From Swiss-Prot:
NDH-1 shuttles electrons from NADH, via FMN and iron-sulfur (Fe-S) centers, to quinones in the respiratory chain. The immediate electron acceptor for the enzyme in this species is believed to be a menaquinone. Couples the redox reaction to proton translocation (for every two electrons transferred, four hydrogen ions are translocated across the cytoplasmic membrane), and thus conserves the redox energy in a proton gradient. Residues 1-18 have a biased composition (Low complexity). It is found in: Cell membrane. This is NADH-quinone oxidoreductase subunit D. Residues 1-37 are annotated as: Disordered. It is a peripheral membrane protein. NDH-1 is composed of 14 different subunits. Subunits NuoB, C, D, E, F, and G constitute the peripheral sector of the complex. It comes from the Bacteria. One of its GO terms (cellular component) is plasma membrane. The gene is nuoD. Keywords: Cell membrane, Membrane, NAD, Quinone, Translocase, Transport. Belongs to the complex I 49 kDa subunit family.
Length: 470
């Protein structure tokens, strides 16, 4: 029987339509590709052939009218801001389709939190977005404090220091964006300048927290320790120098013809597109919408600080560059106000059932086992030692409930959904990372543009794959 051409099939008979032969139809044994995955043209239409195991090929056979090239960018590509894989379908130099592949940096951070105490979970979450670890710590600790009902009990000095270190971190993060973005566009001087100033910020954070990155400095109830001697002087020296550096960036890049040619009117995404995709942060503000959670939904007393929310209307890569530069200047204003507000006082809540020891000097090994620390724990009574042992090993209990807390990170809205079942460990911690959401905009930014502009588009979003994959 002659098979019908109305449905795909596998057969050893030639493909013909009922009552007539196929134009150019392949015959058995003629060595043609009719018996491989693909299609042939017949008088009644196109006939698809599947020989088994070739489904992936046949699914796209109908779209192969024109020649297409698929290019893999990453996951080891230096311009993908981490282990991000971009699968680009191109027609000449034009990108027709962009697909993102993530997950290469998954480390199970959220799941790991379920096997640690509420305080120990900070050491995992600070490693999610590794370019802004203090924001992960702050958002998580604010969530735990809401569940505990101690938000209003956090000492004023601890809250001010939290704002101080977060704004320092914002500057450091934007400087990494400037340096890596400059490197990807061939502006090596911008790379050198950006990392030069970032080193100064990391030196300040190391002075304050003991570590350059992954600080575990912000903890439920307050901070790990107070500011060491000389911190205020070092920060004020930085505040005096940094405005000159920002002006230097403007002189170097803002009017530079090649820099502008690569970024102006490139990777445009307007406010409506940002809202539809859930994009936040500098990308949204560069589209004209002044949405900044420090202003719209204040936390940590941000409503008492004076600063502006930089915006632009062009919604292109150059506008995102300008917004980030202006944000660094606004962060400097906030840091200066923090220094003026610092008053002596505790940096941890008074409730000893929650508070880990604070106000203690750190030993030479950085582990907090200085003589002052040991004397505070063991030099009082056996009951004090037992309490400390149980607090550290078992942790404190958090009442059952769930809470969602969002803050404004350097990349946008960073949200934490924290669930407690009444135990000493989190039942669930879910991170709404801005890089994960903002990456959804990359196809909208890049499709229809040039291959070279893909690098600009990804850089303008500024994703951190540690936060994306977690």
């Amino acid at each position: 029987m002659t098979p019908s051409t109305s449905t795909p099939h596998t057969s050893t008979a030639p493909h013909t339509s009922t009552g007539q032969s196929t134009d150019g139809a392949a015959q058995p044994g003629d060595g043609s590709s009719a018996y491989e995955a693909g299609f042939t043209e017949s008088a009644s239409g196109r006939v698809y052939t599947v020989t088994g195991g070739d489904w992936e090929e046949i699914l796209g056979a109908g779209e192969q009218d024109a020649e297409r090239i698929v290019v893999n960018m990453g996951p080891q590509h230096p311009s993908t801001h981490g282990v991000l894989r971009l699968v680009l379908e191109i027609d000449g130099e034009t990108v027709t389709e962009t697909r993102l592949v993530i997950g290469y940096l998954h480390t199970g951070i959220e799941k790991s939190c379920e096997y640690r105490t509420w305080t120990q979970a900070v050491t995992f979450l600070t490693r999610a977005d590794y370019l802004s670890p203090l924001y992960n710590e702050a958002a998580y600790c604010l969530s735990v404090e809401k569940l505990l009902g101690i938000t209003d009990d956090i000492p004023e000095r601890a809250t001010v220091i939290r704002v101080l270190v977060m704004e320092l971190q914002r500057i450091a993060s934007h400087l990494v964006w400037l340096a890596t973005g400059g490197m990807e566009l061939g502006a090596t001087t911008a790379m050198i300048f950006g990392f030069r100033e970032r080193e100064k910020v990391l030196d300040l954070l190391e002075l304050i927290t003991g570590l350059r990155m992954n600080h575990a400095f912000i903890r439920p109830g307050g901070l790990a320790q107070d500011l060491p001697d000389g911190t205020e002087r070092a920060i004020r020296e930085f505040l005096a120098d940094m405005p000159k550096r920002i002006r230097e960036y403007h002189r170097l890049l803002t009017g530079q013809p090649i820099w502008k040619a690569r970024m102006v009117d490139v990777n445009v995404l307007d406010a409506a597109g940002c809202i539809a995709l859930g994009v936040t942060g500098p990308v949204l503000r560069a589209a004209g919408l002044p949405w900044d959670l420090r202003k719209t939904m204040p936390y940590c007393g941000y409503e008492t600080y004076e600063f502006d929310v930089p915006t632009a209307l062009e919604a292109d890569s150059f506008a995102r560059y300008l917004v980030r530069l202006e944000e660094m200047g606004e962060s400097l204003k906030i840091i200066e106000q923090c220094l003026d507000r610092l008053r002596p006082g505790p940096v941890m809540v008074a409730d000893k059932k929650i508070a880990w020891p604070a106000q203690l000097s750190i030993g030479a090994d950085g582990m907090g086992n200085s003589l002052a620390h040991i004397r505070n724990i063991m030099g009082t009574s056996m009951e004090a030692l037992i309490h400390h042992f149980k607090l550290v090993t078992e942790g404190f209990r958090v009442p059952p409930g769930q809470v969602y807390t969002q803050i404004e990170s350097p990349r946008g809205e960073l949200g934490y959904h924290v669930v407690s079942d009444g135990g000493t460990r989190p039942f669930r911690v879910h991170v709404r990372d801005p890089s994960f959401v903002n990456l959804q905009a990359v196809p909208a930014l890049t499709e229809g543009g040039q291959v070279a502009d893909v690098i600009v588009g990804v850089a303008s979003v500024d994703p951190v794959l540690g936060g994306v994959d977690r």
